[in-house]
Amino acid sequence: ELIAIIPAVHPVAQKAAPPGEPLATLDLNEIRYEPFVLMDRNSTLRSLCDQIFARSGFQPNVLFESNNTAGIVSLVKSTICCGIVPWYYTRIPSDELACFRLPGHPSWDITVSYPTTGYLSTGAREFIRLASKWWKTIQPDQI
């Protein structure tokens, strides 16, 4: 799921849920005039963000573009902009961020495919097993 992140010092941050509680939902129009840092315009994540903003009825003021999602989080923590990132990057609470779900709970599904009729090495089979196990452990119980 994609999550809106804003600096904890932003006035809208007071609407965030307390730590340990499910995230509150934020209408992006509440921060429509704020600068944003988003993924590079050629990325899949940016395409999804552009669709989210279009559904919200505005185009964001993009202050920075990045190829690094963790970099987006760092820029938001520095209090100069807002961002949208996958939930994974917000799973550890931070006093510097306020995190919100978005209306409709947009998500980015990641899939891996491999031929079931072809040969898979022991290493490839082990990678599939470990990746599957890892992704199952990071799924949020409650966002």
Q: Which residues does each predicted region cover?
A:
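Short loop segments at secondary-structure junctions
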Residues: P7-P11, T116-G118
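A short, charged helix-loop
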Residues: V12-P19
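Secondary-structure junction motif
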Residues: P19-D27, E34-S56, L120-I128, W135-I143
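Residue-level "edge-of-site" marker
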Residues: T44, S66, Y88
